[in-house]
């Protein structure tokens, strides 16, 4: 009985060895694939890609990403990709009203040196739990996220809307990047001192009456860092007439505080980067008017 079991096991062992050898032999005879089984996402170049190469990458070394990428997104928010045709319009808008305005006033070398090297776009706003939503963010001085691209069409003919949802936020975030390169005077944060309220800026009573308290916007009350960026962005993106109306609403004390801050912002930009904010505002206002008046073709992808 023992001998029979042993013989059977021995036979099975030999059979297994033969089977394995046959399998390995068969495998060794197969031709290896000439392509790796590990693939990287590949995309077909569009007219837009070639236009971006000519107008963003070549002159400025800026990557304008309009295709959705998980790695560039903030997974704390639900969002969607930017629509192709609206990403095209936004790329024109950013180039004409922002990038080329800095070229005009500060020279192309300034823009090449300091403007963020990546612009990543998403279709939806990033909504927060406190009832606000994120329009734009800057990361590490090299990347700007632009959200809400899919709403661009409805705002293109209105300068105030373009400022509120897109242009002011771009200049605001660019200011943060400049501040990371050259810091502003610590005296700035002493002007409003203990009046900053952090995340309470969007809640009553801080969501009204900011001008009278010496802040150019409600969000400027968040911190001195946001206050500085808001001062620059709100000044260059809005007309002299609008600014004067805000100062009248602010009253004597509010106007005094805001004017003190503005002078420090102007001095910072001129001394640190050679940028005249009055000249920059003039350039932006002219370019903004040309866009909202339909004088700039935001769909043109020609390479001529």
Regions flagged by a language model, labelled:
Residues 1-11, 17-67, 293-304:
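Bacterial Sec-dependent N-terminal signal peptides
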Residues 31-32, 88-143:
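Auxiliary, metal-adjacent structural segments of Zn-dependent hydrolase domains
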Residues 62-82:
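Acidic/histidine-rich, surface-exposed loop or edge segments in extracytoplasmic proteins
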Residues 76-84, 132, 153-165, 214-222, ...:
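Second-shell loop/turn segments in exported
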Residues 102-120, 181-182, 242-252, 277-283:
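Surface-exposed patches in mature extracellular/periplasmic domains of secreted proteins
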Residues 160, 164-185, 229:
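Active-site recognition of the HExxH zinc-binding catalytic motif
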Residues 180-199:
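Short acidic alpha-helical/loop segments enriched in Asp/Glu that coordinate divalent cations
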Residues 196-278, 287-304:
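Metalloprotease/metallohydrolase-associated module, dominated by Zn2+-dependent proteases
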């Amino acid at each position: 009985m023992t001998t029979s079991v042993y013989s059977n096991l021995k036979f099975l062992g030999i059979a297994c060895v033969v089977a394995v050898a046959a399998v390995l032999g068969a495998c060794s005879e197969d031709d290896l694939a000439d392509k790796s089984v590990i693939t990287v996402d590949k995309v077909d170049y569009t007219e837009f890609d070639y236009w971006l190469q000519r107008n963003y990458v070549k002159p400025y070394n800026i990557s304008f990403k309009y295709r959705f990428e998980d790695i560039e997104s903030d997974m704390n928010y639900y969002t969607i990709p930017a629509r192709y045709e609206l990403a095209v319009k936004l790329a024109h808008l950013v180039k004409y009203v922002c990038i080329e305005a800095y070229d005009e006033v500060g020279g192309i070398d300034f823009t090449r040196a300091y403007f963020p090297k990546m612009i990543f776009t998403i279709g939806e706003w990033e909504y927060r739990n406190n009832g606000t939503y994120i329009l734009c963010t800057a990361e590490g001085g090299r990347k700007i996220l632009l959200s809400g691209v899919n709403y661009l069409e409805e705002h293109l003919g209105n300068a105030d809307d373009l400022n509120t949802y897109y242009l002011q936020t771009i200049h605001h975030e660019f200011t943060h990047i400049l501040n990371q390169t050259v810091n502003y005077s610590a005296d700035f944060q002493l002007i409003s001192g203990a009046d900053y309220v952090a995340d309470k800026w969007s809640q009553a009573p801080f969501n009204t009456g900011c001008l009278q308290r010496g802040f150019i916007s409600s969000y400027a009350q968040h911190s001195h860092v946001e206050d500085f960026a808001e001062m620059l962005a709100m000044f260059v993106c809005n007309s002299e007439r609008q600014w004067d109306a805000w100062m009248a609403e602010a009253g004597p004390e509010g106007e005094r505080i805001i004017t003190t801050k503005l002078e420090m912002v102007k001095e910072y930009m001129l001394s640190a980067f050679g940028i005249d904010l009055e000249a920059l505002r003039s350039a932006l206002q002219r370019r903004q008017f040309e866009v909202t008046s339909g004088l700039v073709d935001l769909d043109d992808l020609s390479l001529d």
